[in-house]
């Protein structure tokens, strides 16, 4: 309660827009992201908190497809959370470049990871059945054929140990309102593997996508 009062009366009430720099708001997406990173096996500085999970799915997929310009297939499974599939379909329509969302049964994911696939979009834990995909094996299979991976951690982050670094995941997204106990309205997050940072650019970048928003 004391922190909230300070934020409302001092940081927002007095600093107003200068609070972005003077109160440290500008760095909170990364500083909070570092706390999430410890729970999902990610490197400090490579998880950013903000927006919604659906937006983060869009951003991760857009980056992955841009990194594989010669491939047109997004591979997912019928047990995936519906909004992930909706975002993939929306991105495909926006790109209008002949991409395909290929949806297979959960147990058939591995055998369908072929050289046609640009990126796999998989929710680690099925929200209906609790089925858990083997992140390490599926990521290795994807990399063996030159594909990238986007993992949705909505039903795993905070529920059990996740090891993005150990599994070699390329991208991961998640939310903080479920097993991270952020509550209603709390933001999503995105992870980009360090090896990809120099080869990706933010999709849907806005005011905070500028290197110096107040310049």
What is the meaning of each model-derived region?
Residues 1-215:
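Pyridoxal 5′-phosphate
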């Amino acid at each position: 309660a004391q922190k909230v009062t300070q934020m409302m009366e001092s940081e927002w009430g007095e600093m107003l827009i200068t609070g972005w720099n003077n109160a440290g708001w500008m760095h909170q997406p990364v500083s909070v992201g570092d706390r999430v990173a410890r729970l999902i096996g990610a490197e400090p500085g490579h998880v950013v908190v903000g927006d919604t999970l659906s937006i983060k799915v869009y951003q991760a997929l857009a980056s992955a497809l841009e990194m594989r310009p010669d491939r047109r297939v997004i591979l997912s499974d019928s047990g995936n959370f519906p909004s992930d599939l909706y975002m993939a379909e929306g991105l495909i329509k926006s790109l209008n470049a002949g991409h395909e969302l290929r949806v297979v049964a959960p147990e058939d994911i591995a055998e369908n990871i072929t050289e046609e696939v640009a990126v796999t979009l998989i929710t680690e834990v099925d929200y209906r059945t609790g089925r858990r995909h083997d992140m390490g094996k599926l990521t290795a299979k994807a990399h063996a054929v030159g594909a990238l991976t986007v993992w949705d951690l909505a039903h795993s982050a905070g529920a059990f140990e996740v090891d993005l670094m150990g599994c070699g995941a390329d991208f991961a997204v998640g939310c903080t309102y479920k097993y991270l106990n952020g509550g209603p309205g709390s933001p999503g997050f995105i992870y980009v593997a360090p090896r990809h940072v120099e080869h990706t650019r933010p999709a849907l970048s806005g005011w905070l996508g500028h290197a110096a928003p107040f310049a």
